[in-house]
Amino acid sequence: MAKNIAKALLDIEAVSLSPNDLFTWSSGIKSPIYCDNRITLGYPEVRNAIRDGLIQLIKEHFSNVEIISGTATAGIPHAAYISEKMELPMNYVRSKSKSHGKQNQIEGAKSENKNVVVVEDLISTGGSSITAVEALEEAGANVLGVVAIFTYGLAKADETFNKAHIPFYTLSDYNELIEVAKDDGKISLNDIQTLVDWRDNLS
């Protein structure tokens, strides 16, 4: 499954590799990879494969889940697809509380005393995932873990999740993506070393 998802992300250009002309992330980090999983929403076959893959992860690792929770904004549609097929309640978590109305950070199903799985699109350092987890826990939820489409495989993410005592699972990862890109002739051996060095240095 990891290989198929990686290939799909590359084919629809939800993930782009550019070892010799770096992208600039919003954080300012210069990177040979750019990931925008929102593009998957425009490809029903891909988004359905993602939905079914994430459901498989949830059933395998978090079978006692009661609520599916999406991270705003990119995790929301995938959480919706999952909750619909699993026939489970859903909510979503903002990065911070609204400044008006009831100032809610969590919208949708009530999480108190419920087993919740958080759905992310992408894990880089894990910071946004854990922000959502902490908001849910403050609301009384029992967060079982996090599932996501893709991870860069940074050591920082492992540290972040381990510190919070929250497990996470992804459909595909950076290593798989590099392997697929190599097999498809999209990158050279020199490119592979550049990509590996970038990730290792960032970790």
Swiss-Prot record:
<feature type="binding site">
    <location>
        <position position="100"/>
    </location>
    <ligand>
        <name>5-phospho-alpha-D-ribose 1-diphosphate</name>
    </ligand>
</feature>
<feature type="binding site" description="in other chain">
    <location>
        <begin position="120"/>
        <end position="128"/>
    </location>
    <ligand>
        <name>5-phospho-alpha-D-ribose 1-diphosphate</name>
    </ligand>
</feature>
<dbReference type="InterPro" id="IPR000836">
    <property type="entry name" value="PRibTrfase_dom"/>
</dbReference>
<feature type="binding site">
    <location>
        <position position="98"/>
    </location>
    <ligand>
        <name>5-phospho-alpha-D-ribose 1-diphosphate</name>
    </ligand>
</feature>
<dbReference type="GO" id="GO:0044205">
    <property type="term" value="P:'de novo' UMP biosynthetic process"/>
</dbReference>
<keyword id="KW-0460">Magnesium</keyword>
<feature type="binding site">
    <location>
        <position position="94"/>
    </location>
    <ligand>
        <name>5-phospho-alpha-D-ribose 1-diphosphate</name>
    </ligand>
</feature>
<feature type="binding site">
    <location>
        <position position="124"/>
    </location>
    <ligand>
        <name>orotate</name>
    </ligand>
</feature>
<keyword id="KW-0665">Pyrimidine biosynthesis</keyword>
<dbReference type="Pfam" id="PF00156">
    <property type="entry name" value="Pribosyltran"/>
</dbReference>
<keyword id="KW-0808">Transferase</keyword>
<comment type="similarity">
    <text>Belongs to the purine/pyrimidine phosphoribosyltransferase family. PyrE subfamily.</text>
</comment>
<dbReference type="InterPro" id="IPR004467">
    <property type="entry name" value="Or_phspho_trans_dom"/>
</dbReference>
<comment type="function">
    <text>Catalyzes the transfer of a ribosyl phosphate group from 5-phosphoribose 1-diphosphate to orotate, leading to the formation of orotidine monophosphate (OMP).</text>
</comment>
<comment type="subunit">
    <text>Homodimer.</text>
</comment>
<dbReference type="GO" id="GO:0004588">
    <property type="term" value="F:orotate phosphoribosyltransferase activity"/>
</dbReference>
<dbReference type="GO" id="GO:0019856">
    <property type="term" value="P:pyrimidine nucleobase biosynthetic process"/>
</dbReference>
<dbReference type="GO" id="GO:0000287">
    <property type="term" value="F:magnesium ion binding"/>
</dbReference>
<dbReference type="InterPro" id="IPR029057">
    <property type="entry name" value="PRTase-like"/>
</dbReference>
<comment type="pathway">
    <text>Pyrimidine metabolism; UMP biosynthesis via de novo pathway; UMP from orotate: step 1/2.</text>
</comment>
<protein>
    <recommendedName>
        <fullName>Orotate phosphoribosyltransferase</fullName>
        <ecNumber>2.4.2.10</ecNumber>
    </recommendedName>
</protein>
<keyword id="KW-0328">Glycosyltransferase</keyword>
<dbReference type="InterPro" id="IPR023031">
    <property type="entry name" value="OPRT"/>
</dbReference>
